[in-house]
From Swiss-Prot:
This is Glycogen phosphorylase, muscle form. The modification N6-(pyridoxal phosphate)lysine is found at K681. Homodimer. Homotetramer; to form the enzymatically active phosphorylase A. It is an enzyme of class 2 (transferase). The gene is PYGM. The modification Phosphoserine is found at S15, S430, S514, S747, S748.
Amino acid sequence: MSRPLSDQEKRKQISVRGLAGVENVTELKKNFNRHLHFTLVKDRNVATPRDYYFALAHTVRDHLVGRWIRTQQHYYEKDPKRIYYLSLEFYMGRTLQNTMVNLALENACDEATYQLGLDMEELEEIEEDAGLGNGGLGRLAACFLDSMATLGLAAYGYGIRYEFGIFNQKICGGWQMEEADDWLRYGNPWEKARPEFTLPVHFYGRVEHTSQGAKWVDTQVVLAMPYDTPVPGYRNNVVNTMRLWSAKAPNDFNLKDFNVGGYIQAVLDRNLAENISRVLYPNDNFFEGKELRLKQEYFVVAATLQDIIRRFKSSKFGCRDPVRTNFDAFPDKVAIQLNDTHPSLAIPELMRVLVDLERLDWDKAWEVTVKTCAYTNHTVLPEALERWPVHLLETLLPRHLQIIYEINQRFLNRVAAAFPGDVDRLRRMSLVEEGAVKRINMAHLCIAGSHAVNGVARIHSEILKKTIFKDFYELEPHKFQNKTNGITPRRWLVLCNPGLAEIIAERIGEEYISDLDQLRKLLSYVDDEAFIRDVAKVKQENKLKFAAYLEREYKVHINPNSLFDVQVKRIHEYKRQLLNCLHVITLYNRIKKEPNKFVVPRTVMIGGKAAPGYHMAKMIIKLITAIGDVVNHDPVVGDRLRVIFLENYRVSLAEKVIPAADLSEQISTAGTEASGTGNMKFMLNGALTIGTMDGANVEMAEEAGEENFFIFGMRVEDVDRLDQRGYNAQEYYDRIPELRQIIEQLSSGFFSPKQPDLFKDIVNMLMHHDRFKVFADYEEYVKCQERVSALYKNPREWTRMVIRNIATSGKFSSDRTIAQYAREIWGVEPSRQRLPAPDEKIP
């Protein structure tokens, strides 16, 4: 497995991040051997590369456990306010390298594996991604956990341990096929099952009203078993916990209905209960009102709240005896953050526990609930908003429906008092939507039941106040805040782009890794020839490495000197991968028209998954691959234009492609992308952005200066005006010859000669019912892309612009985001203080 060292690798050994201590390396080798033999029960004659990965993982994990136990002891002794981040998704990716980075073990492990004749990078590639998320929302939760640990907050991530995460995407004949993601097949060395904290969760049943109050009876019980994963902060010896619940049937499941011969069936039917945590719903920005999904949402909430209350009541470390019974202090000790409306049932569930079980009166319980809960909104797309049918809630959670009705009644009384006589406002603001199917609007429930409501970028938060939540803002303006999203610089710079992290550290030191605003110091290097050269060199090395990866994995040849033009994100009409396609075809047609004219060579890479039931998104993937089939095999084009669909885009692939990108495509219709976080990752890794004034792009352009950003297209106001006037695609088709040619090519089967009408649905949508107005931005987009190519011809000026972008990306650290949540929503103060290491005395 060992190979000669490249110059870059030899240079790594004189890293400013310090050499591996000899005794450290010896110790790691000893522990590696111990785990190979005693944990995995293998010797070198029968060990596979996967065994070596597991041995290394266990060796690294050993360095976490002392810190993990210490951290939890510290929290029990200090009893700080706890932060509970509730999310149906945590898109964690791989854990090994991130743990080594945060614990400063990377060099020592690299040296130890090298001395054992192993290649650490090859071992890292064996780890499965923990793909427990769809896209941005789940990845944000993962970045937030990293930042909360790095800022020393007593924080816990709570979610579901899906047996199957986001599907693996295979492209067959240009079409997306889904494959189950059996990520736990070989076991997960990072989790620790905690069966002793298993808790019951109730479903169905009925409500009995007694003199003591309401009782929820005759329920079906499913057990929630927690699995804990350590979350290390950056070099501060803090290790927090992500606790994921797995569904288990109770031992007496269905056996009370026991009849002769029924026993076997009863045992087989245990699967029905355990299906709750079987699979992640693969929808991004789309609501699918299925009973199993509602069960998942209640399952995580019910188990988590029991855990929160148990921890609140027992103030001593490891003690399960109730101590605190007064809930007045609950909001001073507990903050619950709802990541979108998916965990919104936390509000009625907390009310149920306080009123029915803890016997608080309604007003006191409501005060506690509102002070405890806060809600983050992630989208304004109407099809993404959760509206659960009343009949489903009535069957599955009858007591919660009653509580929601009571919340609604009291809420509407407040609205009526504040706006007397405004009947339509009552209808608009009700948690209950009347119609053919009566529904509960979960966003309205969250706003009513939270003390803070935030959007995830400044423009998004403004849109919330002016449009979908306008009525609520007028009632309670103090609730509404903005918290612009961020990304963790540990994973998204130090881990994925060590070359860039290194040359930055050589100029400004290493403190920027936990204080990203320090990147501003790089502004004084914009004209430094050596730094310009270094930045360009690192980018070229990353491009060569990614080109080699594509060749190895997909047998795809690309020109590493071409401009790497990258759009990677979920496939969705609002993200406008189709606009990108129109540009690619424009470039192709121009080359065909003037084959001898110089063009800046481009490799256009598009990647992302389509929800399995989203027909248009799947057609878009087929179109991208079809364009590639034509463009990549046209001898006239040569290597001046290549179109690559990146199969199975996921966290571990993002870590490879983002550092190699020259151009980042962030081209959603203004007003549709709440924030975006991929945009920030590209900026931090030295790509330039072409984008609309949408989501966080607005703030990125503000930080970098608009002259260092390729901005095009309609602003939100322009989109609104166009809506009022009526968007007519035909106007653009008639006026723009290049656009007309493309649509004719799509209609005539130019890109699908065996099936001429293959793309008729796409053409029909673009021409007649395109909600996202692709044609309206086409001309400006193509012109803006010409400016991109022109700048790319001047490598020095391009790199200077890159440096300005990197230097102004500090705002987009999730450390900044979390510090704002902490101070402005949770009422806690972040801290960069180190805990003592396990081998240090506690002061």
